[in-house]
Amino acid sequence: MSHTMSQSQPTTVKHDTLFTTPLDKAARFSFDEQVVACFPDMIRRSVPGYGQVLAMLPIFARRHCKYRQQSDSGQRVSRIYDLGCSLGAASMTLAGEFEPQDLQIKAIDISPAMTTEATTLLNDNYPEHDIEVITADIRDIELEPCDMVILNLTLQFLPAADRVAVLEKIYVALSEGGILVLTEKTHAFDEQYDAWLVERYYDFKRANGYTEMEISGKRNALENVLITDTLDEHHARLSDVGFQRHLTWFQFLNFVSIVAFK
């Protein structure tokens, strides 16, 4: 049944110290080599519930990946897209729970620094699995028919005007019975609720060792780079592109994960 995941991150994980010194306020966050070097630590300490979201992906895949596609060799497989894959954590989580012949995974990210490291990690840990890492803008690629699409903390980095088109493309590519897993940071429509959630999120980061300077520095760097939607906006957009059924299956403070059914 499963292959135990032997390694899901670089052998030497650098501590996230990117914002320990004051930065130029005009500097913007980017997924460059510096971020790649400490990315696992950054995610662990700044994205509540990320591990739980990853752990559920194989469970969802077991239910909805029904080998509806065909590999180059003619074998029945389930094709899965990991869009905005970063270091390939979602792809590795899936590979660790499926036989190599069961899945064809396409992991895509716009950052060459990310895809270079992801390729190394995936090749080192799952050399027998059919996993292709692609450096590309997800707005520009054509999706092949697939059983599952993972969009973890990715849509929020796209211009708002481009988000519908990406979701439309995903909806068309999904086979009947397939799913989209959409995980995003959100904001609440009510300003008081949102302020409470944001402050509790900063408390979460403080509890994980981030200083006030680091919290402020990253907030400034992400301004106009990471643009959140409300939960209602996400659900409305999914309905608009054709998904008739979608639900919020996970929420931790202002981070949510939605599953949408084709």
From Swiss-Prot:
Top-level EC class as recorded in UniProt: transferase
Amino-acid positions noted as binding S-adenosyl-L-methionine in the UniProt annotation, renumbered to this chain: Y50, G84, C85, S86, D137, I138, N152, R219
Species the sequence originates in: Psychrobacter cryohalolentis (strain ATCC BAA-1226 / DSM 17306 / VKM B-2378 / K5)
Source organism phylogeny: Bacteria, Pseudomonadati, Pseudomonadota, Gammaproteobacteria, Moraxellales
Entry keyword S-adenosyl-L-methionine: yes
Pfam families named among the record's database cross-references: Methyltransf_25
GO molecular function, one term: S-adenosyl-L-methionine binding
Assembly with partners or alone: Homodimer.
PANTHER family in UniProt: CARBOXY-S-ADENOSYL-L-METHIONINE SYNTHASE, TRANS-ACONITATE 2-METHYLTRANSFERASE-RELATED
Family statement drawn from the similarity comment of this UniProt entry: Belongs to the class I-like SAM-binding methyltransferase superfamily. Cx-SAM synthase family.
GO biological process terms on file: tRNA wobble uridine modification
InterPro entries referenced in this protein's UniProt entry, alphabetically: CmoA (IPR005271), Methyltransf_25 (IPR041698), SAM-dependent_MTases_sf (IPR029063)
The keyword Cell division appears for this protein: no
The organism's place on the tree of life at top rank: Bacteria
Function as written in the Swiss-Prot or TrEMBL entry: Catalyzes the conversion of S-adenosyl-L-methionine (SAM) to carboxy-S-adenosyl-L-methionine (Cx-SAM).
Entry protein name: Carboxy-S-adenosyl-L-methionine synthase
